[in-house]
């Protein structure tokens, strides 16, 4: 929907019959015009792990941001986002047996610093006047409203369990 709204062209990485990805074909898809490369680390359909680290390198060589869906990988394997060099890494808590409605979005600090908040309120505001607001430092800059404390406690317990 976002691509349609802003006129972006979506390109898809095709899988072989065995579910593998040809890195040479990926290399052809990522150009200097590519802004975002988004993919799953492990397929929920095929159960296959993909070469996210190698694809992140290709994306970064062209100046693109790498976004990784870790919903299927985080419950089953140790994930090191810095080793993957993912700019963003997201997973839902319920896949780890945490309560519904909580998840994690990791983002590189230098990217998050440049991003404006998309919600407002609560502790995300450091100071406010009648004409302007100063946002709090990370991570509070993106935490509008009341924190889901019960969900966070459940997520921690689920991570410890896994």
What are these regions (language model features)?
Residues 1-162:
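Pyridoxal 5′-phosphate
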């Amino acid at each position: 929907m976002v691509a349609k709204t802003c006129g972006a062209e979506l390109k898809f990485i095709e899988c072989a019959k065995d579910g593998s990805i040809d890195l040479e074909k990926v290399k052809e898809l990522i150009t200097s015009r590519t802004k975002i490369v988004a993919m799953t680390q492990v397929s929920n359909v095929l159960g296959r792990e993909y070469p996210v680290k190698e694809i992140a390198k290709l994306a970064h060589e062209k100046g693109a941001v790498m976004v990784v869906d870790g919903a299927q990988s985080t419950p089953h394997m140790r994930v090191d986002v810095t080793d993957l060099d993912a700019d963003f890494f997201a997973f839902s808590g319920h896949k780890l047996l945490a309560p519904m409605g909580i998840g994690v979005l990791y983002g590189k600090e230098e990217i998050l610093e440049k991003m404006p908040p998309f919600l407002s309120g609560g502790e995300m505001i450091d100071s406010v006047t009648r004409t302007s607001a100063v946002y709090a430092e990370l991570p509070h800059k993106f935490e509008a409203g009341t924190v889901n404390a019960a969900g966070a406690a459940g997520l921690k317990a689920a991570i410890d369990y896994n």
